Amino acid sequence: MAESILVPVDGSDESIKALEYAVEEYSDTDLTVLSVVNPGEAYDIEIVVDAHPRSDPPETANERAKAALERAKEIAPDAETVRARGPVSQTIVTYAEDESTDLIVIGSRGRGGASRVLLGSVAETVARRAPCPVLIVR
């Protein structure tokens, strides 16, 4: 059984669903909620997909990360919350390695096929590179 679980959140419905799943299924486990701000990303992927590019200054990305962690605290008040900066997938994997995480529970938007190849998927990249099992919640 997993002793330490990492749940990356970005405030999306999918990441909150993954957190709720982790809280329900792993209530006796040390839970860490991680929000990653990538200062190098100029666009939100949803906005690029919708053809309405918008550049978010770092303050906005930080505000979103803070809001995601505040929401996480409502769902999992006993969880440790961590905010990190860097490329999202890489930062999640590195954190899991550094902290000897037993399991990562991550949400997925459920994109597949060409859109997944074109846009990439944080959940898919984490699943391929993580040092531990990854449970993807849809």
Short names for language-model regions:
Residues 2-49:
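Small/aliphatic-rich secondary-structure junction motif
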Residues 32-34, 80-84, 135:
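General small-molecule cofactor/ligand-binding pocket signal
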Residues 49-52, 98-99, 122-124:
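Short, hinge-like loop/turn segments at secondary-structure boundaries
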Residues 51-67:
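A short acidic, glycine-rich active-site loop
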Residues 73-104, 129:
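Structural beta-alpha unit
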Residues 102-138:
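Gly/Ser-rich helix-loop-strand patches that form or flank binding pockets
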